[in-house]
Amino acid sequence: EIVGRLSAGNIPALLGLENVKAGETIASVKPFVPFESVHYVTEPVVTMAVEPKFARDLPKLVDLLRKLNLEDPNLVTSINEESGEYLISGMGTLHLEIATTLITKTGLEITTSKPIVIYREAIRSKAGPVEGKSPNRHSKISIEVEPLEDAVIELMKSGKISEYGDKTEMARSLREIGWEADEARGVWSIDEPYNMIVDVTKGAQYMQEVRDMILAGYRWGLKEGPIAYEQIRGLKVKITDISLHEDPVHRGPAQIMPMTRRAMFAAFLIAQPTLLEPIQRITTKVPGDLLGAVTSVVSQKRGKVVSVDQKGHLVYVTGELPTVETFDLSEVMRGQTAGRAFWGLEFARWSPVPASLIQSVVEQIRKRKGLSLEPPKPSDFME
């Protein structure tokens, strides 16, 4: 039945909403407060490039990627701005294999790159305030950085605080976990994955006029961190002071954005930066006589066994291992267990790359991206 009006409590079917994702709010009036968006526990941890075998099929590929993204919010599609490649990112190699299979089933021939693990950049301590100057040297900003508290991240995960939530309620929630009142009131933005910028300046002139430019510089930095041009995670940025030129001509985006990013990067590099790698939880079901083989595979893959449970003649082994070590897991596990083990993988958490490996991992990432092998120093972003 087609109706023009439906009261609360009913479930309608809507047609023609081609670009609407699951969890979005649809409204015909403005302004309106959207419903809380759907929060997904997992984040994309593996990415690959995909392109059509024939250039004429590019529009079809773009359309298919858009539809896949709408149907599966955990699958992220993007464009590499430097190479022009279309990238798909998901929760693991199997997730990407399913996506590419769905594409080829439409009759479109594609080629793909080898899957690459996604890393995150983070800090382990507090640093700043660090001063950054605009390219024309007429304006300057002071920034502090620190790891975002676990309690705040939990509030984000639960949806109690969000970018589009009530600011008064957000401030109250932050005060309840120990934030000072001025910090709680000064939150400008909450950005994925779990980052926040806070204004604690007092009586700064022209601040509202440059606010969007500061946010743009901050988000520019979040998108590609200074260590390996990987996305930054779990960062709290505080603006502690700012001095702006009185003439708007001298404080435009070309001045404010790089000023903000440079100060943020200098502080970031002082605050004991590190790389985070995605960790997968592996659950394995295997006959008891093959328990040693399974635990051996997990250990060989830089992993650890979390629990072992006996149920009848079968043993259930739960462990954790880095995503980068799972690419050939099928072959290794089959070889060690003669194909008698059944297992599944799911994203568990982000964990710092071991100190013994971080230099080589950073160099590999920077080499792949065409960067110099040595990461920048704080002084590279300071006057």
Where do the model's predicted regions map?
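Accessory interaction regions appended to the cores of large information-processing enzymes
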Residues: 1-383
